[in-house]
Amino acid sequence: MRKESIFGGKIVTLYELYAHVFEVGAKSVENMKFTLEHKAPSSKARAGLIQTDHGPIQTPIFMPVGTAAAMKGIFHRDLKEEAKAQIILANTYHLYLRPGMDIIEKAGGVHRFSTWDGPMLTDSGGFQVFSLSDCRKLKEEGCHFRSHIDGSKHLFTPESVIDTERTIGADIMMAFDECPPGDAPYDYAAKSLALTER
């Protein structure tokens, strides 16, 4: 589905976007709310507040990357108190392959698994899958790829990635996107965007 057909060109809130795109009544989506708090009079800069089940996020914000749902070399307490982190990013591709969804699910989701009690965003893993150019095949149904860990075969589809992110228990989930190289021709980049927006 193209963006224009979904929203008719109007600007939507983060809540509306997630509620529509994922077509779910997931608790984290129902309770998510974005409030625009400040707009700069002379530029497009703005500040806001995103409410999630795991706490508020002031925007703009520094978001540390904990690829496997853990920050290396720093305790969560210090991450919050010293670095003032309000949200961390975890990667769906890496969590899917190791430790795997069975372990994440048995732990009660990524927050319990990692002991991070604040908001968490999951990247779809699209960049990682598409960077495996020798180990992946893009088809209409999704992307077939081989694990960089053990060579096992997998298929990521937009639906399977969202299901995986739901199992992870992220507060904010990124859609599975094709990530063309920075020097990709315009036509290829436009085709990639259309594929992501469907």
Predicted regions and their residues:
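Short hydrophobic alpha-helical segments enriched in small aliphatic residues
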Residues: 8, 16-23
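Short, basic/low-complexity N-terminal boundary segments at the transition from targeting/disordered tails
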Residues: 14, 22, 29-35
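Non-catalytic, usually N-terminal nucleic-acid engagement modules in DNA/RNA processing proteins
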Residues: 31-198
